[in-house]
């Protein structure tokens, strides 16, 4: 009986140790992130690569800026006026997490005064031609500290606030492809600071949170509508010029073959 009584706690301790080991392994996997922003020729653009088990599972290149309204006292110290802080995403610490249907990127900077979390989901839709998978940016959360003096000057009720997206469906892309968009895009975030809306401005975006085949290599790009329209506007004059030139050549050729009498 004594041996059995001693064996049970040993088994329990072993289970606890295994659970702790599993938890630590998950934490280590989440923190396997590489910040390659130094490779970018654009000083405003950041590059993040999340790896799990030695394999790239999320890649993100983008420039981000946050427009944050906050209250300060007017010169009479009676009225409140609204100022605006422009906060750029800088090259700080980061945490990533990958999954089959959910992936996440978190970035912290200025001693964790600011934190950005981006959640991506992959979904299947029943279409007339059969099931179709897409992925999208489903949630953005931005945490900021208005007592941080670099961007905020004498903010009233200074402290940490959280701004969240609401029913977000952005960067929608067919599964297996990366999303690319050079144009600026804005996302509105409702702040815990009463009656304040934070604006997130994204640009020079190239993201793939799922189905990466080769390390550090994006899959085929799915371009945003704005970029496609701008590309068409750039190439259309060239196409029209070529057509006009061809018409002139054909007209001259016909004129020489059939000269007027």
Swiss-Prot record:
Gene Ontology terms: cellular component: cytoplasmic vesicle membrane; dendrite membrane; early endosome membrane; endoplasmic reticulum-Golgi intermediate compartment membrane; endosome membrane; growth cone membrane; late endosome membrane; lysosomal membrane
Primary location recorded for the protein, binned into one broad class: membrane
Gene Ontology BP term (one): establishment of protein localization to organelle
Glycosylated residues, chain numbering: 35, 53, 126
Disulphide bridges: none
Pfam families per record: Lamp2-like_luminal (PF01299)
Localization (cell): Cytoplasmic vesicle membrane; Cell membrane; Cell projection, Dendrite; Cytoplasmic vesicle, Secretory vesicle, Synaptic vesicle membrane
Post-translational modification: Glycosylated.
Membrane topology (Cytoplasmic): 256-261
Protein name as it appears in the record: Lysosome-associated membrane glycoprotein 5
Protein source organism: Pongo abelii
Gene: LAMP5
